[in-house]
């Protein structure tokens, strides 16, 4: 054996790797099947033929991250556990994400973006490599849905419209070649990571108010964030790129359009343009060797703040 590869989802309805007791680990396949049996007649009660396939699908495969309180550190805790069990072999997470089921409404929102960015950074030291599942809503396990935003696993919709998680991982990739050590910075209500480019001409700070509790329902007031960065000289500029309700939110654009099915090329182009994210100037002050900026973060918002030297 040369390496270990595994998959994990925070909302996995069966494995719940980090939440299992010793009794759970000893369950037989038959016991697990019995536990998850459902009354199909009761499950589909109230559904009408005109409701379409998606509501039925969501009843058959409910998503834990939409209904339950889950530990946001599941991926990190499990990765450390797997690495210990691997006895020195390289560990790869070749498939992971927050939602374990296709059709989960959160898959189209910034809730997934915030989870994936923070989880990837938290588990970085435990893994040789990892791959978020998956890149596009078009994949071989299910047929296409008429709804453009139907809770597919992809970072892009079936017509190639970038979702919040696509924007977040792209910005993370572009943040810099060197990650700075900030012990404990990912563990608070506001999680933070910092990066600089190879030439040390710019510093980028990622912040997110990521929360996995009651994934679909949790709404809390925006939190004021005061960011202080020590620099040898005042930066030439400071810029911010946001992923929130108004930025990088193609689902909202589609809903405001009336949730059309089978999008036209013009509609795809419009939603893509309206939900694009770009860096904008952010006012700052510089005194006593430090640059200071302020902004706000709502639940599962993400902000990348770039200090250009």
List each language-model region with its residue ranges.
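Carbohydrate-binding surface patches
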Residues: 187-234, 238-259, 299-304
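Aromatic/acidic polysaccharide-binding cleft in carbohydrate-active enzymes
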Residues: 95-214
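Short aromatic-enriched loop/helix-cap "lid" or pocket-rim segments at secondary-structure transitions
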Residues: 15-19, 104-106, 142-146, 251-254
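Flexible, active-site-proximal loop/turn residues at the rims of small-molecule/cofactor binding pockets
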Residues: 10, 136, 309
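C-terminal beta-strand-rich structural cap/linker in extracellular carbohydrate-active enzymes
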Residues: 262-309
């Amino acid at each position: 054996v040369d390496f270990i590869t595994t998959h994990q989802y925070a909302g996995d309805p069966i494995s719940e790797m980090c939440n299992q007791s010793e009794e759970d680990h000893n369950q037989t396949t038959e016991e697990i099947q019995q536990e998850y049996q459902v009354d199909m007649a009761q499950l589909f009660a109230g559904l009408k033929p005109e409701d379409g396939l998606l509501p039925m699908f969501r009843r058959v495969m409910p998503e834990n991250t939409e209904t339950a309180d889950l530990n946001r550190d599941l991926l990190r805790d499990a990765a450390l556990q797997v690495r210990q069990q691997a006895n020195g072999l390289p560990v790869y997470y070749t498939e992971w994400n927050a939602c374990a089921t296709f059709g989960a409404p959160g898959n189209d929102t910034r809730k997934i973006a915030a989870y994936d960015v923070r989880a990837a950074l938290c588990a970085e030291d435990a893994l040789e490599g990892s791959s978020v599942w998956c890149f596009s809503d078009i994949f071989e396990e299910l047929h296409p849905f008429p709804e453009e935003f139907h809770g597919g696993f992809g970072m892009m919709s079936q017509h190639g419209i970038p979702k919040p998680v696509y924007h977040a991982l792209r910005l993370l990739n572009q943040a810099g070649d060197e990650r700075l050590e900030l012990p404990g910075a990912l563990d608070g209500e506001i999680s933070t990571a910092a990066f600089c480019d190879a030439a040390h001409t710019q510093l980028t700070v990622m912040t997110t108010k990521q929360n996995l509790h009651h994934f679909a329902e949790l709404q809390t007031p925006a939190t004021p964030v005061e960011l202080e960065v020590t620099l040898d000289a005042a930066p030439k500029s400071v810029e911010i790129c946001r992923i929130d309700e108004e930025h990088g939110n193609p689902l909202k654009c589609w809903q405001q359009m009336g949730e059309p099915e089978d999008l036209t090329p013009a509609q795809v182009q419009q939603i893509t343009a309206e939900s694009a994210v770009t860096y904008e100037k952010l006012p700052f002050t510089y005194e006593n060797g430090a640059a200071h900026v302020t902004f706000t973060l709502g639940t599962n918002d993400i902000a990348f703040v770039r200090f250009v030297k």
